[in-house]
A protein has these predicted regions:
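Nucleotide/phosphate-binding catalytic cleft detector across ATP-hydrolyzing
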Residues: 1-82, 100-102, 125-127, 134-179, ...
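A short acidic Gly-Thr/Ser loop motif
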Residues: 83-90, 96-99, 107-112, 214-219
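Conserved phosphate-binding/catalytic loops in two-lobed NTP-binding clefts
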Residues: 228-257
Length: 301
Protein backbone atom coordinates (compact mmCIF):
# COMPACT_ATOMS: atom_id res chain seq x y z
CA UNK A 1 0.00 0.00 0.00
CA UNK A 2 1.29 3.47 -0.93
CA UNK A 3 1.29 5.85 2.06
CA UNK A 4 2.98 8.85 0.46
CA UNK A 5 4.07 9.96 -2.99
CA UNK A 6 5.88 13.25 -2.42
CA UNK A 7 8.26 15.28 -4.59
CA UNK A 8 11.89 14.68 -3.63
CA UNK A 9 13.72 16.64 -6.36
CA UNK A 10 12.61 18.92 -9.16
CA UNK A 11 14.60 19.31 -12.38
CA UNK A 12 14.41 22.38 -14.61
CA UNK A 13 16.01 22.05 -18.06
CA UNK A 14 18.39 19.41 -16.72
CA UNK A 15 19.32 21.34 -13.56
CA UNK A 16 18.75 19.11 -10.52
CA UNK A 17 17.99 20.00 -6.92
CA UNK A 18 15.33 22.69 -7.40
CA UNK A 19 13.35 22.89 -4.17
CA UNK A 20 10.30 24.75 -5.49
CA UNK A 21 9.84 25.38 -9.22
CA UNK A 22 6.79 27.61 -8.79
CA UNK A 23 7.27 30.91 -10.62
CA UNK A 24 10.33 29.75 -12.59
CA UNK A 25 10.52 29.51 -16.39
CA UNK A 26 11.77 26.39 -18.16
CA UNK A 27 11.31 24.32 -21.29
CA UNK A 28 11.25 21.02 -19.38
CA UNK A 29 10.16 20.25 -15.84
CA UNK A 30 10.93 16.93 -14.17
CA UNK A 31 10.34 15.57 -10.71
CA UNK A 32 11.72 12.66 -8.71
CA UNK A 33 9.01 11.27 -6.45
CA UNK A 34 9.72 9.60 -3.11
CA UNK A 35 7.16 6.86 -2.57
CA UNK A 36 6.59 5.40 0.90
CA UNK A 37 4.92 1.98 0.96
CA UNK A 38 3.75 -0.34 3.73
CA UNK A 39 2.09 -3.72 4.06
CA UNK A 40 -1.56 -3.24 3.22
CA UNK A 41 -3.15 -5.56 5.80
CA UNK A 42 -1.75 -3.91 8.97
CA UNK A 43 -2.67 -0.46 7.66
CA UNK A 44 -6.23 -1.53 6.87
CA UNK A 45 -6.54 -3.15 10.30
CA UNK A 46 -5.41 0.11 11.91
CA UNK A 47 -7.92 2.11 9.89
CA UNK A 48 -10.75 -0.26 10.82
CA UNK A 49 -9.79 -0.08 14.50
CA UNK A 50 -10.07 3.71 14.42
CA UNK A 51 -13.34 3.57 12.52
CA UNK A 52 -14.71 1.10 15.09
CA UNK A 53 -14.23 3.88 17.64
CA UNK A 54 -16.60 5.99 15.48
CA UNK A 55 -13.80 8.20 14.13
CA UNK A 56 -12.98 9.01 10.51
CA UNK A 57 -9.48 8.51 9.11
CA UNK A 58 -8.44 11.49 7.00
CA UNK A 59 -5.02 10.09 6.11
CA UNK A 60 -2.38 7.59 7.17
CA UNK A 61 1.04 9.14 7.81
CA UNK A 62 4.31 7.25 8.16
CA UNK A 63 5.72 7.69 11.66
CA UNK A 64 9.20 8.88 10.54
CA UNK A 65 7.62 11.59 8.41
CA UNK A 66 5.44 12.82 11.27
CA UNK A 67 8.28 12.76 13.79
CA UNK A 68 10.46 14.79 11.44
CA UNK A 69 7.91 17.60 11.53
CA UNK A 70 8.17 17.68 15.32
CA UNK A 71 11.90 17.16 15.93
CA UNK A 72 13.91 18.30 12.90
CA UNK A 73 14.56 21.97 12.15
CA UNK A 74 14.35 23.43 8.62
CA UNK A 75 18.09 24.19 8.74
CA UNK A 76 18.89 20.57 9.56
CA UNK A 77 16.67 19.38 6.71
CA UNK A 78 18.60 21.65 4.36
CA UNK A 79 22.12 20.72 5.50
CA UNK A 80 21.46 17.00 5.91
CA UNK A 81 20.08 15.12 8.89
CA UNK A 82 19.12 11.60 9.88
CA UNK A 83 16.17 11.12 12.21
CA UNK A 84 16.33 7.87 14.18
CA UNK A 85 13.08 7.04 15.94
CA UNK A 86 13.56 4.26 18.50
CA UNK A 87 10.18 2.70 19.19
CA UNK A 88 9.23 -0.30 21.28
CA UNK A 89 9.62 -2.91 18.54
CA UNK A 90 10.86 -1.00 15.48
CA UNK A 91 13.50 1.65 14.88
CA UNK A 92 12.74 3.92 11.92
CA UNK A 93 15.45 5.92 10.16
CA UNK A 94 14.72 8.78 7.76
CA UNK A 95 17.32 10.83 5.89
CA UNK A 96 16.67 14.42 4.82
CA UNK A 97 18.79 16.75 2.69
CA UNK A 98 18.23 19.92 0.67
CA UNK A 99 14.92 20.28 2.50
CA UNK A 100 13.53 16.99 1.20
CA UNK A 101 13.01 13.44 2.42
CA UNK A 102 15.47 11.19 0.59
CA UNK A 103 15.22 7.78 2.24
CA UNK A 104 13.47 5.61 4.82
CA UNK A 105 14.48 2.36 6.48
CA UNK A 106 13.05 0.27 9.32
CA UNK A 107 15.01 -1.95 11.71
CA UNK A 108 13.03 -4.69 13.50
CA UNK A 109 14.64 -3.83 16.84
CA UNK A 110 13.59 -1.41 19.55
CA UNK A 111 13.60 -0.57 23.23
CA UNK A 112 11.58 -3.70 24.04
CA UNK A 113 14.64 -5.74 23.09
CA UNK A 114 16.55 -4.04 25.91
CA UNK A 115 13.72 -4.83 28.33
CA UNK A 116 13.68 -8.48 27.24
CA UNK A 117 17.46 -8.73 27.63
CA UNK A 118 17.24 -7.39 31.20
CA UNK A 119 14.44 -9.81 32.09
CA UNK A 120 16.36 -12.74 30.62
CA UNK A 121 19.72 -11.82 32.17
CA UNK A 122 18.36 -11.46 35.70
CA UNK A 123 15.49 -13.95 35.51
CA UNK A 124 12.83 -11.42 36.51
CA UNK A 125 9.42 -10.36 35.27
CA UNK A 126 9.18 -8.16 32.24
CA UNK A 127 7.42 -5.44 34.24
CA UNK A 128 10.34 -5.42 36.67
CA UNK A 129 12.81 -5.23 33.80
CA UNK A 130 10.94 -2.31 32.22
CA UNK A 131 11.03 -0.41 35.50
CA UNK A 132 14.76 -1.06 35.94
CA UNK A 133 15.44 0.17 32.42
CA UNK A 134 13.43 3.37 32.79
CA UNK A 135 14.40 4.26 36.38
CA UNK A 136 17.98 3.05 36.75
CA UNK A 137 19.11 2.10 33.25
CA UNK A 138 21.79 4.05 31.42
CA UNK A 139 23.74 3.85 28.20
CA UNK A 140 26.86 5.28 29.86
CA UNK A 141 28.83 3.60 32.64
CA UNK A 142 29.83 5.49 35.79
CA UNK A 143 32.70 4.81 38.24
CA UNK A 144 30.16 4.41 41.05
CA UNK A 145 28.06 1.77 39.26
CA UNK A 146 29.83 -1.18 40.91
CA UNK A 147 29.13 0.09 44.41
CA UNK A 148 25.55 1.24 43.76
CA UNK A 149 22.90 -1.37 44.51
CA UNK A 150 19.44 -0.84 43.01
CA UNK A 151 16.21 -2.59 44.11
CA UNK A 152 14.52 -4.83 41.57
CA UNK A 153 11.04 -4.22 42.98
CA UNK A 154 9.25 -0.88 43.07
CA UNK A 155 8.64 0.80 46.45
CA UNK A 156 5.79 -0.94 48.25
CA UNK A 157 6.21 -4.14 46.21
CA UNK A 158 9.04 -5.67 48.22
CA UNK A 159 8.83 -9.44 48.38
CA UNK A 160 6.79 -9.73 45.18
CA UNK A 161 8.06 -11.55 42.13
CA UNK A 162 11.19 -13.67 41.73
CA UNK A 163 14.58 -12.91 43.25
CA UNK A 164 16.88 -11.54 40.56
CA UNK A 165 19.84 -13.65 39.51
CA UNK A 166 22.91 -12.39 41.37
CA UNK A 167 20.87 -10.18 43.73
CA UNK A 168 21.61 -9.70 47.44
CA UNK A 169 19.29 -10.64 50.30
CA UNK A 170 17.21 -7.51 49.68
CA UNK A 171 16.74 -8.38 45.99
CA UNK A 172 19.08 -5.64 44.82
CA UNK A 173 21.53 -5.82 41.92
CA UNK A 174 24.64 -3.82 41.11
CA UNK A 175 23.90 -0.99 38.73
CA UNK A 176 27.02 -1.92 36.76
CA UNK A 177 25.44 -5.26 35.81
CA UNK A 178 22.29 -3.52 34.58
CA UNK A 179 24.27 -1.00 32.53
CA UNK A 180 26.30 -3.84 30.97
CA UNK A 181 23.13 -5.53 29.70
CA UNK A 182 21.73 -2.25 28.35
CA UNK A 183 24.92 -1.27 26.50
CA UNK A 184 25.28 -4.75 25.01
CA UNK A 185 21.87 -4.52 23.34
CA UNK A 186 22.47 -0.92 22.32
CA UNK A 187 25.72 -1.90 20.62
CA UNK A 188 23.77 -4.35 18.45
CA UNK A 189 21.13 -1.73 17.65
CA UNK A 190 23.64 1.00 16.75
CA UNK A 191 25.43 -1.47 14.48
CA UNK A 192 22.21 -1.88 12.52
CA UNK A 193 21.76 1.90 12.50
CA UNK A 194 25.22 2.36 11.01
CA UNK A 195 24.57 -0.17 8.24
CA UNK A 196 21.21 1.39 7.36
CA UNK A 197 22.65 4.91 7.20
CA UNK A 198 25.49 3.69 5.00
CA UNK A 199 23.02 1.98 2.65
CA UNK A 200 21.18 5.32 2.26
CA UNK A 201 24.41 7.22 1.54
CA UNK A 202 24.46 8.97 4.90
CA UNK A 203 28.13 8.37 5.66
CA UNK A 204 31.46 10.17 5.62
CA UNK A 205 31.33 13.78 4.48
CA UNK A 206 27.85 13.24 3.01
CA UNK A 207 26.36 12.67 6.47
CA UNK A 208 25.39 15.30 9.01
CA UNK A 209 23.51 15.66 12.27
CA UNK A 210 21.65 12.73 13.82
CA UNK A 211 18.46 13.34 15.81
CA UNK A 212 17.04 10.71 18.16
CA UNK A 213 13.31 10.46 18.88
CA UNK A 214 10.83 7.89 20.14
CA UNK A 215 10.41 6.41 23.60
CA UNK A 216 13.79 4.68 23.38
CA UNK A 217 15.49 8.08 23.09
CA UNK A 218 14.53 8.82 26.71
CA UNK A 219 17.10 6.33 28.02
CA UNK A 220 19.76 8.14 30.06
CA UNK A 221 23.00 8.70 28.14
CA UNK A 222 21.77 7.30 24.83
CA UNK A 223 22.77 10.39 22.81
CA UNK A 224 26.40 10.08 23.94
CA UNK A 225 26.40 6.33 23.24
CA UNK A 226 25.00 6.70 19.71
CA UNK A 227 27.35 9.60 18.98
CA UNK A 228 30.36 7.48 19.90
CA UNK A 229 29.04 4.54 17.85
CA UNK A 230 28.18 6.51 14.70
CA UNK A 231 30.99 9.05 14.88
CA UNK A 232 28.82 12.09 14.23
CA UNK A 233 26.95 14.69 16.32
CA UNK A 234 23.77 13.41 17.96
CA UNK A 235 21.04 15.26 19.82
CA UNK A 236 17.73 14.29 21.39
CA UNK A 237 14.72 15.57 19.45
CA UNK A 238 12.03 17.05 21.66
CA UNK A 239 8.76 18.12 20.03
CA UNK A 240 7.39 21.61 20.67
CA UNK A 241 4.63 22.09 23.20
CA UNK A 242 1.24 22.48 21.57
CA UNK A 243 -1.69 24.19 23.18
CA UNK A 244 -4.09 21.61 24.55
CA UNK A 245 -1.50 18.85 24.99
CA UNK A 246 -0.19 17.99 28.48
CA UNK A 247 3.34 19.05 29.35
CA UNK A 248 4.36 15.39 29.60
CA UNK A 249 3.78 15.02 25.85
CA UNK A 250 6.68 17.36 25.03
CA UNK A 251 9.10 14.42 25.19
CA UNK A 252 10.75 12.28 22.47
CA UNK A 253 8.24 9.49 23.07
CA UNK A 254 5.40 11.69 21.78
CA UNK A 255 7.21 13.00 18.70
CA UNK A 256 4.88 11.16 16.31
CA UNK A 257 1.77 12.48 18.08
CA UNK A 258 2.89 16.10 17.90
CA UNK A 259 4.22 15.57 14.39
CA UNK A 260 0.83 14.34 13.17
CA UNK A 261 -0.73 17.63 14.30
CA UNK A 262 1.97 19.66 12.57
CA UNK A 263 1.79 17.51 9.42
CA UNK A 264 -1.97 18.00 9.16
CA UNK A 265 -1.57 21.75 9.60
CA UNK A 266 1.15 21.95 6.92
CA UNK A 267 -0.73 19.69 4.45
CA UNK A 268 2.32 18.89 2.24
CA UNK A 269 2.02 18.09 -1.45
CA UNK A 270 1.16 14.49 -2.30
CA UNK A 271 1.17 13.54 -5.97
CA UNK A 272 -1.82 11.25 -5.49
CA UNK A 273 -3.98 14.13 -4.30
CA UNK A 274 -3.39 16.29 -7.38
CA UNK A 275 -6.65 16.68 -9.26
CA UNK A 276 -6.27 14.77 -12.55
CA UNK A 277 -8.69 17.22 -14.12
CA UNK A 278 -5.87 19.75 -14.37
CA UNK A 279 -3.49 17.35 -16.11
CA UNK A 280 -3.67 17.47 -19.94
CA UNK A 281 -4.01 14.02 -21.48
CA UNK A 282 -3.48 15.05 -25.12
CA UNK A 283 -1.71 17.75 -27.12
CA UNK A 284 -3.66 20.84 -28.19
CA UNK A 285 -3.10 22.82 -31.36
CA UNK A 286 -4.86 25.53 -33.30
CA UNK A 287 -8.32 26.50 -32.03
CA UNK A 288 -8.19 23.61 -29.56
CA UNK A 289 -5.26 25.22 -27.80
CA UNK A 290 -6.96 28.64 -27.80
CA UNK A 291 -10.11 27.16 -26.31
CA UNK A 292 -8.01 25.41 -23.64
CA UNK A 293 -6.38 28.73 -22.66
CA UNK A 294 -9.73 30.53 -22.54
CA UNK A 295 -11.16 27.76 -20.37
CA UNK A 296 -8.24 28.09 -17.95
CA UNK A 297 -8.72 31.88 -17.78
CA UNK A 298 -12.41 31.47 -16.97
CA UNK A 299 -11.66 28.90 -14.25
CA UNK A 300 -9.01 30.92 -12.46
CA UNK A 301 -10.12 34.51 -13.07
Amino acid sequence: MVLHAQPAHYTLDGAHGVANPAGLHAEALGVDIHVTVAEGAPVRNLIEAVQTAHLDVEAVVASPLASAYACVTPEERELGVALIEIGAQVTNISVHSAGMLLGLKSIPLGSNDITDAIASSFGIRRSQAERLKCVSGSAMASPTDHSEMIPVNAPGEEGEGPIARGADEHNRIARAELVAVVTDRLAHLTGEMHRSLKDMGFSGSRGGQVVLAGGGAELHGIAEFVQAALGRPVRIGKPPRLQGLPEAHATPGFASLVGLCLYAADDPVDIRSVDPGYQPTRRYSGFGLVNRVLQAVREYF
